Amino acid sequence: MLWYCEFYKVENIKITEGAFFLDILKFMQHLKLSVVPDSTGMVGFNPGPKTHDGLYFEKQSDEEGNKTLNLMMRMANRLIGEGMRTTVSDLEKDWHEDMIWWGPGGIGASYTYDGYLKGHTGPFEENLEFVEFSGHVLENSEGNFGGWFGWPNLKMRPKGNYMGLTQNTDLIGEMRVVDLYRRDKNKIAENWILIDHLHFLKCIGIDLLERNRKLKD
């Protein structure tokens, strides 16, 4: 299954810009290609919102949309301020305890605070050094849903065995990230994430597509 996300800018009833993200690494995992390491989270199908209300056909309340955007930005600013490090006390401020984190290829999905710390933030913090937050191209919300993307959002330097791929280098990798959120009352309930891991890994000298090609030759 090929997971993707699209963003478009419309001016004068025509599309003027677009951004298209493909989670090729997740696709490679579904194909069980040997060059892709095991994930620390669950690898499978990432569904839509469990509330089944992700499609809006009518204008939503600006007030509700602003609540969602403010929550997203509060959480992000706290995370960036902590150098991309997360604790349970941090999560308690912005996330429901039964949060679902639908992670990208290479990481996988996590459930609850403990699952999130074990499946994502623990390995992420242990094996990557935060270098720079590069900002977002778009931050937007409507009703209980919102999201952003960057090109890139983050710059990180490997310092260990990130995603099972050891790389001793001073090279800095760019992370192009999509984050989509569902707010439930005053906290985040679900989060869908895409990371262009193939681009990040290539920045630090790891070309998984080339490795896979060589295995087939």
Name every feature range the model reports, one short phrase each.
Residues 1-217:
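C-terminal and inter-domain tail/linker signature
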